[in-house]
């Protein structure tokens, strides 16, 4: 499966409630209908931000983004052909007037599940996106991340067993602004991933432990820049198909 992922920050002149209402009540149903009738879109997923106010976690997960939008396809060819249909579509499909173009970004990649959540246990998901470490080419970084890093992670049950979901998205630089300007600006982030856990406390515990810092974190730093990532935390996912 392939996925267009869009980290969306709203236009500052629009309230979060108004932005999410337009996104969920108007845009997402229209986009799902159009993408399936005119293209090969499988589904639209809108993830809503978890309210972390009063939890002490806002400093860890600052509310930079207001929503995460996912457009799912069977192949890169399906994605490219369908996105071209959106680019020439009607005004109701446009979201660019409602977002902050200086912050919002999207990218396209192949989804590679490493620990699927078949039982739907992920009450909370964290989606991240980042860049490869200097000195690595993207293909080699993708290969190491896919083949070696999950093996390393499984050596740390304090992290691996707490996660109900871990999937990688290997993004490819095969689209540009001309295909996604109706949604938000395109910016290439080679690597993105979804991690899930039943609760935010369990998700934090998966990464806030000595074994993660001693074993997994150094491996992440070999091929990527985990200190410089986009992050979005959600406890509500809405699917439109």
Residue ranges and their predicted role:
Residues 1-241:
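Macromolecular interaction modules
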């Amino acid at each position: 499966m392939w996925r267009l992922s869009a980290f969306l920050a709203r236009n500052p002149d629009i309230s979060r409630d108004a932005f999410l209402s337009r996104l969920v009540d108007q845009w997402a149903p229209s986009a799902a209908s159009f993408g399936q009738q005119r293209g090969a879109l499988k589904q639209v997923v809108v993830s809503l931000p978890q309210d972390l106010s009063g939890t002490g976690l806002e400093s860890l997960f600052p509310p930079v983004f207001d929503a995460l939008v996912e457009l799912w396809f069977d192949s890169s060819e399906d994605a490219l052909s369908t996105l071209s249909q959106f680019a020439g579509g009607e005004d109701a499909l446009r979201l660019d007037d409602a977002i902050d173009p200086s912050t919002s970004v999207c990218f396209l990649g192949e989804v590679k599940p490493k620990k699927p959540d078949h039982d739907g246990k992920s009450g909370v998901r964290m989606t991240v996106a980042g860049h490869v470490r200097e000195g690595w080419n993207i293909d080699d970084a993708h290969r190491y991340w896919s083949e070696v890093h999950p093996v390393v992670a499984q050596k740390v049950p304090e992290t691996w067993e707490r996660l109900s979901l871990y999937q990688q998205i290997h993004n490819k630089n095969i689209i540009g602004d001309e295909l996604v300007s109706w949604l938000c600006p395109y910016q290439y982030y080679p690597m993105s991933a979804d991690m899930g856990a039943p609760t935010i406390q369990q998700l934090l515990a998966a990464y806030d432990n000595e074994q993660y810092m001693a074993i997994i974190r150094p491996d992440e730093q070999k091929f990527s820049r985990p200190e410089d990532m986009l992050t979005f935390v959600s406890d509500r996912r809405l699917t439109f198909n």
